[in-house]
Amino acid sequence: MLLIKKLFVLSIVTFSLFFGTSALARDYYVSTAGDDTNPGTENKPWKSIEKVNATDFEPGDKILFQGGKTFAGTIKLDENDSGTKESKLIVTSYGQGRATIDGGSSSGIVAGSSHLVVKNLNFVGAGRKNGSEGTGVLIRDCEDVEIDNIDVSGFRAGGAIFSGVHNGRMTNVYAHENGATGISAGASEKRWSENLYIAYCVAENNPGDPCNLTNHSGNGIVIGSVSNAVIEFCEAFNNGWDMPREGNGPVGIWAWNGNNIIIQFCIAHDNKSPGHDGGGFDLDGGLTNSILQYNLSYNNEGPGYFLCQYPTASVFKNNIVRYNISQNDGTKNNRKSAIDVFAADVGMSDCEIYNNTVYNSKGAGIAFGGLDVPGIVIRNNIFICGGELITGESKRGRFEGNVYWPVEGCTMTFDGYKTFDEWVAATGQEKIGDTVVGKYIDPGVVNPGMATLTDPKKLADLKAYRLKADSPCIGEGLPIDNNGGRDFWGNKVPDKCKPSIGACQVP
């Protein structure tokens, strides 16, 4: 008899080791037709979020809300509800369509659970001006979190937020009609966020936080106090128009106070601000070793691409803006330019702006403001402008190997000089030794001013801004090491020999 008991215990231990804790995982169903005294099975579901919050969940468990139905309250999960790397805790919908979590004046879900997946749900708040105090999705101080395929709207404090999250993913998030921001990530009281991936998201019409009278609000996607992050294939538009203050303002997609941030293959258009900014993309104060590449910006009230050092920020250094396109940005704010470099404090230096294509019939190609910034180099760009090439009050960066041409029917001037030749002779810009390396010539660009694309997944199909077969920009740029290896459309770019000028390598 003793031998049988020992074998029975051994078989249980072996089963647990082989199958892991997920062997004990359960699916918990929540339905508007349920009852919280039920066991939470599909046939006998729970009814409320309160029951969910009163339950401790195990790795591999699923919390399933009935699709097409609305559930009032805030889902609250903590570290005791965490999954494991192999058996994640999942919060999602079941049946037809998505379930809606109505956070009312509070939040939709607040979680500190690691190894968590939240997907296929709608989160709605009372409205940024109708009593909402919360956030749609707030994940904090945990790791290995996935947010996918959600719609979040009506939250004053923001749509979807990572705070102190390590190894987090947000994909296919539609954030709209929120206050402070559509999507954001940053530090908690305990730690920075790190190793983040934000992709295939849309931030639309997040106008501003009516209660924030001291700082920017109405951002599309913003991350700060983050190390190692990629934002790609996202669209941000019509954000920031109702920020309730003047001063520093929102941006479509941007990052600040971090390291190794890449923003690529994104579109930012028609973003606004009643104060400053309101631009497309921004690498902001305290950022190092970060890149804006392969993006499209157009019709933003602020600059399409902004490099900015705010007061008291940490060092801003070794940042790159390359192979992007800007069309008619800077329509209202800052120095009314496509690209803007601004230093309100020391510590900003050593940044590269190369192989971008700029078309601006409404303002300048590039502007410089605030303090002088050492080590700013502008190479291999195409500037098609309807007036002044350069505006602003501070010392200029170094221009080399760029092509300049006026918008049809306009006259282009150069930092107060009437002609390109006068500018070069007076300033030494566009010269390496005694050789003039810049050109005042029609760059041969296809359909300038005609970009209207809104789907980042289709950027490779953009017809406008390619080079014509006879373009003088083909193979005439200055070699740049570690140039990313590709152009805006995915064509290979040489590393050691002459690339083309602008965002397009080949017709």
Where are these regions (language model features)?
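Surface beta-loop-beta hairpin patches that serve as ligand-binding interfaces in beta-rich domains
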Residues: 417-439, 444, 450-454, 460-507
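Right-handed parallel beta-helix/beta-spiral solenoid domain characteristic of secreted/periplasmic
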Residues: 32, 46, 64-73, 82-135, ...
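Parallel beta-helix/beta-solenoid
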Residues: 58, 66, 79-81, 86, ...
